[in-house]
């Protein structure tokens, strides 16, 4: 239970945290409290970077968190196109059968589950020395292609430098490839819905991942329908949610992982808290417009932070970043939408509870805290 020791202003800690334990809704999906386990490595239900399978270790961790009164679980990021062996997630049907058998056990906890689906990394894909060798040696690249097609995995909106390696540049994705991903999101979401999952989260117009790269002017230099204007840059993300709603129904909840501001000066150069700089990516003015635009396209929730892989420490804030480092920006964007907004990034429960009580955010995202203590 929550400690009864005195908190701020003479109220008990239990009273101070009460806003975290109030119900809310994402579309028609009611969540019992405002505590959200956000996605992180090791919480995948359908495997990761390996032959796809129902991941019993990930399921065990998620179930333990759910049993300890977490309201909404966002399971680990699942690529709709698995980088290893080039497998489309919707083609591996058995793991969805295993997931369906597990879901009643999860739902007994009273928690709700959204599975996070990603289009991938684009220029942010982490490149190891072995991958550099595979890519730069043409013979090895051909031999490795069936299980590690770096050319496809790292494809981006436009030719651009990889975040980590100068030896593996990104090529431009084709329109046909974009359409393949959109179709895959719909098919995968339908399989998850049929397995009993409560919703999905799209990864991501966030942190400079592939979908986000399409929205960012400093990465996206396309001249077709997926580049140039505001509407074109956000088209990929919009067409994904529309496809999911078409296949799964308008009432099936779809969240979006969303970075309010990029906090980025350019390729491989991020901004620090309080620094004066020229934003190369999404600034607040564009974000105000984008948040509503994405809501109107069909997204039912925004799961928010800041940053790109060029400014990674906003989305994965280490100890030297301020606590609640994304809260002010996320609370600001909340004014421009009618859908619920979750804030993540070194959140402390007391500050989160106060922000929820004041209507500044709707839910609080925690991840590493649950690794330390599932209770």
Language model feature labels by segment:
Residues 4-5, 9-375:
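Flavin-dependent oxidoreductase catalytic cores
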């Amino acid at each position: 239970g929550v400690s009864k020791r005195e908190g701020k202003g003479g109220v008990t800690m239990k009273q101070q945290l009460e806003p975290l334990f109030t119900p809310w809704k994402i579309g028609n999906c009611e969540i019992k409290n405002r505590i959200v386990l956000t996605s992180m490595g090791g919480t995948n239900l359908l495997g990761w970077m390996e032959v796809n399978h129902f991941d019993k270790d990930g399921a065990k961790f998620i179930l333990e968190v759910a049993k300890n009164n977490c309201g909404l679980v966002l399971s680990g990021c699942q690529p709709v196109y698995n980088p290893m062996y080039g497998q489309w997630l919707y083609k591996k049907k058995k793991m969805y059968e295993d997931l369906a058998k597990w879901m009643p056990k999860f739902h007994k906890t009273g928690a709700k589950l959204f599975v996070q689906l990603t289009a991938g990394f684009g220029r942010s894909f982490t490149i190891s020395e072995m991958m550099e060798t595979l890519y730069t040696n043409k013979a090895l690249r051909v031999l490795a292609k069936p299980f590690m097609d770096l050319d496809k995995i790292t494809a981006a909106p436009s030719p651009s430098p990889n975040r980590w390696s100068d030896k593996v540049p990104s090529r431009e994705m084709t329109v046909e490839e974009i359409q393949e991903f959109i179709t895959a999101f719909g098919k995968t979401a339908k399989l998850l819905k049929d397995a009993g999952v409560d919703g999905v989260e799209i990864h991501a117009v966030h942190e400079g991942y592939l979908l986000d790269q399409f929205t960012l002017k400093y990465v996206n230099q396309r001249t077709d329908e997926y580049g140039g204007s505001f509407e074109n840059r956000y088209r990929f993300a919009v067409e994904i949610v529309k496809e999911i709603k078409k296949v799964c129904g308008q009432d099936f909840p779809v969240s979006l992982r969303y970075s309010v501001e990029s906090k980025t000066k350019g390729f491989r150069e991020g901004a620090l808290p309080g620094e004066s700089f020229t934003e190369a990516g999404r600034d607040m003015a564009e974000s105000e417009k984008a948040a509503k635009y994405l809501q109107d396209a069909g997204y039912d929730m925004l799961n928010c932070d800041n940053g790109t892989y060029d400014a990674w420490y906003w989305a994965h804030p280490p100890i030297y970043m301020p606590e609640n480092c994304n809260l002010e920006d996320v609370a600001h964007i909340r004014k421009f939408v009618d859908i619920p907004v979750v804030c993540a990034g070194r959140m402390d429960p007391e500050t989160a509870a106060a922000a929820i009580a004041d209507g500044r955010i709707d839910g609080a995202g925690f991840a590493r805290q649950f690794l330390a203590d599932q209770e």
